[in-house]
A protein has these predicted regions:
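N-terminal Rossmann-like dinucleotide-binding module
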Residues: 1-45
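Basic phosphate/pyrophosphate-binding loop/patch that engages nucleotide-derived ligands
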Residues: 107-115
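Beta-loop-alpha module in the N-terminal Rossmann-like domain of NAD(P)-dependent dehydrogenases
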Residues: 16, 48-108
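Short, well-ordered coil/turn segments that N-cap beta-strands
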Residues: 26, 87, 114-115
Length: 115
């Protein structure tokens, strides 16, 4: 079983969350969105624990992967935090709107050898 934290609960995040929930190989342990009411509501739909600080997911040793579906401006920040804690990463596109930030992020991922 692969334990996952989903960050971002907009339309695409909810869609990915429902898909993850249907797959028995995954456990959607945490959901997070900047909107606390939405986090609480969607956590019930996705049968997962709501968190109101994404660092909880990064620091949890049981979390194997971080699924990033938040706004584009948060992607690099969340990716680098996942890299720091050696989590596997899935990030919705685009990674960022700045190619230099993307290149720097890519270098850090290669250095840390995460997925």
């Amino acid at each position: 079983m692969i334990n996952i934290a989903l960050l971002g609960l907009g339309r695409i995040g909810i869609m990915h969350g429902k898909n993850l929930m249907r797959n028995k190989e995954f456990k959607l342990k945490y959901v997070y969105d900047i909107n606390k009411k939405l986090t609480n509501k969607i956590s019930k739909v996705l049968k997962s624990s709501p968190i109101h600080n994404p660092s909880i997911a990064f620091k949890d040793k049981e979390i194997d992967a971080i699924f990033i579906a938040s706004t584009t401006s948060t992607h690099i920040k969340f990716i680098l935090e996942a890299v720091k804690y050696k989590k596997a990463i899935f990030c919705e596109k685009p990674l960022d709107l700045n190619i230099n930030k993307i290149d720097n992020c890519k270098k850090k991922i290669k250095l840390e050898k995460v997925n």
